[in-house]
């Protein structure tokens, strides 16, 4: 089964077909408390359901399929149960989607840009991750992180984020397991060919960081997670750089690449 990586209860509410629910990082370890300073936890009411990436003091990038009503974003979070003094909570002031995104097609242009209702302050546990200066190269070592499921089948959500290293693979590797993805999709293929390391339910919207640069957004994958020859699929951030920068500059009519 193939599903977008979002929590199952939100899938029922938001999506009209079976998709992969958000997951924890499979095959990883607890992140160092200062290893995820740009990672944003997104909550609907009181429940965590997605992640995002802080790209400057006022803007967060996440997946379009993470959109929901009345959500909040928490920054500087490590343990979801034990708050720390550096945590900051923000509401979305504005949300932006690709205006040329195919309506009701969650596989098309899965990116959302969020303006916060007030700027955040950098701290020991909070710092933005800048947009990529160049696209990543196949073979790059990439870092994944999130509060998603740490077990591949049953949903086991950890209290703290897990991190793992995977490899950026050739796009051709992701075509056979995911023929439903458009051939023109602006995505990255990343994982471990033999399986065992992957993003999973609850990791949706979080970052793929390759050689220290924010290169991807957790988007799509197989269920169970971490299967051999079924890597994860990530929205390619570099292809949306111009759109993101245009929106931030005030050109809200900017369109995304086809």
Swiss-Prot record:
Top-rank taxon: Eukaryota
Active site (record annotation): 65 (charge relay system), 110 (charge relay system), 204 (charge relay system)
Sugar-modified residues: 44
Biological process (GO), any one: proteolysis
EC number of the protein: 3.4.21.-
Propeptide section residues: 19-24
Keyword Repeat (UniProt): no
Location of this chain's protein in the cell: Secreted
Subunit structure: Monomer.
Role played: Snake venom serine protease that may act in the hemostasis system of the prey.
Protein name: Snake venom serine proteinase 8
Organism this protein belongs to: Crotalus adamanteus (Eastern diamondback rattlesnake)
């Amino acid at each position: 089964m193939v599903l977008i990586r979002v929590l199952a209860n939100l899938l029922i509410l938001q999506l009209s077909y079976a998709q992969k629910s958000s997951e924890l990082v499979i095959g990883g370890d607890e992140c160092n408390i200062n290893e995820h300073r740009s990672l944003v936890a997104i909550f609907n009411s009181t429940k965590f359901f997605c992640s995002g990436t802080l790209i400057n003091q006022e803007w967060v990038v996440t997946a379009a399929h993470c959109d929901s009503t009345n959500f909040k974003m928490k920054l500087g979070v490590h343990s979801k149960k034990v708050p720390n003094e550096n945590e900051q909570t923000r509401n979305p002031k504005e949300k932006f989607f690709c205006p040329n995104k195919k309506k009701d097609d969650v596989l098309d242009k899965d990116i959302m840009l969020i303006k916060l209702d007030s700027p955040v302050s950098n701290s020991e546990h909070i710092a933005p991750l800048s947009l990529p200066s160049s696209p990543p190269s196949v073979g790059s070592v990439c870092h994944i992180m999130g509060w998603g499921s740490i077990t591949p089948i049953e949903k086991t959500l950890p209290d703290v984020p897990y991190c793992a290293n995977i490899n950026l693979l050739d796009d051709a590797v992701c075509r056979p397991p995911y023929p439903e993805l458009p051939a023109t999709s602006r995505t990255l293929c990343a994982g471990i060919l033999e399986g065992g390391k992957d993003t999973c339910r609850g990791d949706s919207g979080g970052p793929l960081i390759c050689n220290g640069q924010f290169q991807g957004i957790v988007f799509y994958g197989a269920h169970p997670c971490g299967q051999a020859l079924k890597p994860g699929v990530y929205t390619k951030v570099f292809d949306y750089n111009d759109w993101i920068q245009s929106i931030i500059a005030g050109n809200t009519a900017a369109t995304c690449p086809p």
